[in-house]
Each structure stands twice: as C-alpha cells, then as structure tokens.
Amino acid sequence: MKLSKTRTALGFSTGVCSVGAIITLMLANFGGEIHTSKQGLEIIGDAEGCRRDPYQCPADVLTVGIGSTAASGEKIDPKHRYSDLEIAERWKNDIVIAEQCVNKYGNGKQLPQSVFDAAVSITFNVGCGAVRNSTLFKQLRSGNYYQACHEYRKWVYAGGKKLPGLVSRREKEKALCLADLTSH
C-alpha cells in the first residue's frame, strides 16, 4: 500500500510526467550532447507537455514523452509506459536532430545562445523541412538576428487556422530570441 502511494506521488502510476524533472534528468545524463540551454528546453517542454503513455497527437502522429515521435528513427511502442529516463533520452535525441538542422541551415554555430535556443524550439515544433528555407532561417544565415526574431509571429497557423497555443509559444520564442541581442 505504501509503495503504491509513493509511486502515485512521484507520478509513476499516472500518464503525466514533469517537464522540469525530465529537463533535470536529461541535463544530468546527456547535457554534454546538446547545446540548447535549460531556458530553451523549458520553452520547448512547457509548450509540448509530457506524457508517459503514447498517444495520437492532433496531427494523428503517435507521440510520447515531450513531443517525441518516430521521426527521430526510434519507434514508439504504443503499449509501453515510458520511464523518465527513457523520455529524457528520446527527447535528447529529438533535440539533437533539431540542433543539427539549425546548425546546417541556420548557421547555428555562429548564433548567440538565445537566438539558437529559439531556433531549436521552432524547428522541434514544425520540423526541419518547414524552416530550413524560411525567411527566418535566411535571416539567421545572413546574421540579421533582430529581423529573424520578428519572424516567429508568422508561425502561428496550423491547418490554416491561427492557434492560441502557437501564438503564445511564438511570443515566448521571440522573447527568448531577443534576450541575448543588445539592440532591440
């Protein structure tokens, strides 16, 4: 009886997991493998949420953890309840894929940290194919960071509809993007 109460208190018997706990676990175990800051991870994690049990997202894609899909090459077992460590490792792999896109198509290695973090967040959300030839990434490649930061507000539509959740996420990404720039 005591064990089940402890497990419930720690979130093990529920399908929801703590984004903060996953970030802490990911940075402790895999921090050397990613360049995205804790602040960048918080924006992504808070926007995505965290679920232990696989589910079909609104786009009808099997998803688990913090927005993790099979797009990273790792299959999702729809009947498996994922542990915090499994979620942290999957998310690290997904973040690395988004970072590789930002590095390759957005001149990521030259970007200020906050600009890089915001670019990783939008890439994680919409995918590399959607952003790599975008005006946002063209501005990043040209070193026009301030202009790039103002591109985020254009990325608020899904299925032709303006979504409040995307408006909120893009405002947070824009603010993060501008954080390390001296002249706003």
What annotation goes with each model-predicted range?
Residues 44, 115-123, 151-153:
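Short alpha-helical scaffolding segments that buttress acidic/His motifs in well-ordered protein cores
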